Amino acid sequence: MSGTIFIISAPSGSGKSSLVNELRHVVPGLEFSISYTTRAPRGSEQNGREYFFVTREKFDAMLAADEFLEHAEVFGECYGTAKHFVTEALARGNDLVLDIDVQGAAQLKVKLPDAVGIFILPPSRKELEARLKRRNLSDHVAPEVIERRLKGAGKEIENFSHYDYILVNDNFETAVEQLRAIVLAERIRRSSTQISEENRAILEAAECCIRKNAMQRVQSILDSFKDATDPQP
């Protein structure tokens, strides 16, 4: 059985990295692509675990050598997925998780049309702003930087329709369970074995995150960003 590529994207501050890290512990047999980035590590991040932290010169050299399957610049920093992570995982028949932004995801969906896209949303603009402020408090990030990221998030969220599943991270434990269900549901659909009651429950849990079934929740989140940018009377 061939492996599945899972593309996971989210606006900055939506909790994507924490969810993906937890997914490592609750779903066996998953491989994780580690992106290269020119940005500095945050908090407890370690080189080779969350990212490979490289200089701009190193990144540009890899780009010139055609080592990236996708790459993008986000808030002035470069991110890229090395080709070998994907080719090696597919050769082994393993599932692979790619934690990338919407620019990189768009590139990959062209090259890997069968990849499963998962978009993680914050519950509202207000909550995302609060999360960004908490995360950046120790880094002494200027208010205008947070505002720029909020505006960027509003634009990123408009890309939700390019993804197969939509997951709202308003409760971490629930979001982890939904993310786990999505991955396992895709495995079940690829399998020819009879569906058990346990598997049926997994399929039902994933079903609520399919884009068309999450539209009411998505619309309220979109509205929260629109309301913040509309001029007040």
From Swiss-Prot:
Domain Guanylate kinase-like, first and last residues per copy: 3-184
Chief location bin: cytoplasm
PROSITE patterns: GUANYLATE_KINASE_1 (PS00856), GUANYLATE_KINASE_2 (PS50052)
EC number: 2.7.4.8
One Pfam entry name: Guanylate_kin
Gene Ontology cellular component terms for the protein in this record: cytosol
Compartments, record wording: Cytoplasm
CDD domains: GMPK
Keyword line: ATP-binding, Cytoplasm, Kinase, Nucleotide-binding, Transferase
GO MF term (any one): ATP binding
InterPro entries attached to this UniProt entry: GK/Ca_channel_bsu, Guanylate_kin-like_dom, Guanylate_kinase, Guanylate_kinase_CS, P-loop_NTPase
Signal sequence bounds: none
Residues the record lists as binding ATP: 10-17
Domain of life: Bacteria
Cross-referenced Gene3D superfamilies: Guanylate Kinase phosphate binding domain, P-loop containing nucleotide triphosphate hydrolases
Catalytic activity entry: GMP + ATP = GDP + ADP
HAMAP family documented for this protein: Guanylate_kinase (MF_00328)
Function: Essential for recycling GMP and indirectly, cGMP.
Entry's family note: Belongs to the guanylate kinase family.
This protein's name: Guanylate kinase
